[in-house]
Amino acid sequence: MPTINLNKWILQDMTGLNEQELVDYLFKLKSEVSPVSQDEYSIEVNADRLDMLSLGGIVRALKGITGKELGEPSYPVKDTDYVLEVEKVASRPYALACVIYNVKLSPDFYLKELIQFQEKLHDTIGRRRKKVAIGIHDLEKVEGKIIRYAPVSLSTTFIPLNQEREMSVRDVLQETPQGKQYGNISVWDSNSPAIMDERGILSVPPVINSDRTKITGNTKSLLIDVTGTNFESVMETMDLLATALAELGGIIGRVKVRGMSVDRSPVLRHTSVPFSLDDVNKRLGIHVSRDEAINLIRMMRMEVETNKDLAVIVPPYRVDIMNYTDVAEDIAMAYGYDRFTLESGRTASRGSLSEKSEIYRKLRTLLVGAGFQEVYTLVLTKSSYQRGEAVNIANPISVEYDSVRNSLLWNSLVFLSNNQHSRFPVRIFEIGDVVNRDDSKDTKYSNSTRLSMAIMDSRVSYEMLQAPLHEVLLNLLGVAPSYRRFESDIFMKGRSAEVVVKGETIGRLGEANPELLRSFGLLYPVLLAELDLDALRRVM
């Protein structure tokens, strides 16, 4: 859950609430408050409420839930003569911009809070800047009215934020902390995206801004650019920023856009979500009237179409409202979860195992029948045990648990190493999740369920493990697996194979490499197998 820090005195002054009232009302909004210092709160915000990652959003929500202000606020919006020209940028094709006048960035808390909001949006909807990146500039330092978004050569120079010398884009990507962290996201064919005015580069998204347009406590007007790989996310991010600043007294200035599917930015999109009041009452187990429901929705800072059928008018900042289920949840929050009463269940039903659980249960039964004993090991392990790329913990409590396992084999070897005194042969198996690199995911990693099998004995041969594995799969699938030659540093050369079912590779097995065994302190030979159970289920 994202967490933000806010000045307690400013928050209390803007909402008219004391500390206990803030705690109580924010809890009703699924947020938890804890003091950081005498002057600061830490607020843990529910992950879907991106609008509440800012001071303006928190204030707007609290004014609604307390009934001090109802419905969507009317923010001042005016058209400007600024123009954003969007050229073709293959790696990051979407861009929008807006102007905010009459901003308040002094005292320093307001500036700090704006930067915090920017980074929270980067980490959430922006997927660590891969999907969306935000640039915030002092408008008075921008040259001209034409803003361009276009590719630039890596040899193009500018002075990056908080630097004193001019650097090429290439040097920025290679030498600055931001460049090293985000530089590889959008570079293509020796080009990088850039936001530019008449004088030169304003920012190199998603990496860094120019020092020339750096915002300070004296900044009165802002130019905001949002770029990304998904237009919907770019548009929502811009709307969130504009409305949060408007809540604090800013005036939204719309920028003309050329080269995008919209001609003005911010879009400030409104959508309509119809809902049935009878259905909401049934879902929640309450009985609110039509007028009560309308009032509750307006407490959540939204408006309602009051024709024959009701529909919520979703404002630009409520990007979490997608269907009538979300509407029902908002009605429940405004109504108050503390007002719900407990009722005994009126019907009795019997649960059943999912298809996946049935398969794993049968697999366990077959493996136990084959003479193997199930073990359970922790998902966290020691990074020195792992082979290949793995997810490491940034601040581990213990070096023994500083990495997320990328295979079940390493924990099996640790288990065997700790049980070399046991009666031979030792036959074990484990079913559990692992985490591996997956570039197709936004997070770059994905979970998968694996089965590991291991046999330790004074003497072993490949067939000692291949035979029971073959029988288990034959009984489980009704189809005999086949085996294909496979080489890996994990196994001895010529004594390993891939397990293939219906043409798809589902695992590997073989005699463990003696060097691998020595690294785990094992004195006896070991047979290892690991199957991808997600792949196994696909071929069933």
UniProtKB/Swiss-Prot annotation:
Query: What subcellular compartments does it reside in?
Result: Cytoplasm
What this protein catalyses is: tRNA(Phe) + L-phenylalanine + ATP = L-phenylalanyl-tRNA(Phe) + AMP + diphosphate + H(+)
Note the coiled coil stretches, chain numbering: none
* EC number(s) reported in the record: 6.1.1.20
Residues annotated as binding Mg(2+) are D320, D326, E329, D330
Keywords of the record: Aminoacyl-tRNA synthetase, ATP-binding, Cytoplasm, Ligase, Magnesium, Metal-binding, Nucleotide-binding, Protein biosynthesis
Q: Which Gene3D superfamilies match?
A: 3.30.56.10, Bira Bifunctional Protein, Domain 2, Phenylalanyl-trna Synthetase, Chain B, domain 3
Which BP terms in the Gene Ontology apply to this protein?
phenylalanyl-tRNA aminoacylation
Q: Name one Pfam family in it.
A: tRNA_synthFbeta
A single Gene Ontology CC annotation of this entry is:
phenylalanine-tRNA ligase complex
Tell me the InterPro entries matching this sequence.
Answer: aa-tRNA-synth_II/BPL/LPL (IPR045864), B3/B4_tRNA-bd (IPR005146), DNA-bd_dom_put_sf (IPR009061), Phe-tRNA-ligase_IIc_bsu (IPR045060), Phe-tRNA-synth_IIc_bsu_arc_euk (IPR004531), Phe-tRNA_synthase-like_B3/B4 (IPR020825), Phe_tRNA_ligase_beta2_arc (IPR022918), PheRS_beta_core (IPR041616)
Single GO MF annotation: magnesium ion binding
- The top EC class is ligase
Q: Which residues form the B5 domain?
A: 268-342
What this protein needs as a cofactor is: Mg(2+)
Q: Which PANTHER family match?
A: PHENYLALANINE--TRNA LIGASE BETA SUBUNIT, PHENYLALANYL-TRNA SYNTHETASE BETA CHAIN AND LEUCINE-RICH REPEAT-CONTAINING PROTEIN 47
Give the record's subunit note. Answer: Tetramer of two alpha and two beta subunits.
Q: Which family does it belong to?
A: Belongs to the phenylalanyl-tRNA synthetase beta subunit family. Type 2 subfamily.
Name assigned to this protein: Phenylalanine--tRNA ligase beta subunit
* Organism the protein comes from: Metallosphaera sedula (strain ATCC 51363 / DSM 5348 / JCM 9185 / NBRC 15509 / TH2)
**Lineage, top ranks:** Archaea, Thermoproteota, Thermoprotei, Sulfolobales, Sulfolobaceae
Q: Which gene encodes it?
A: pheT
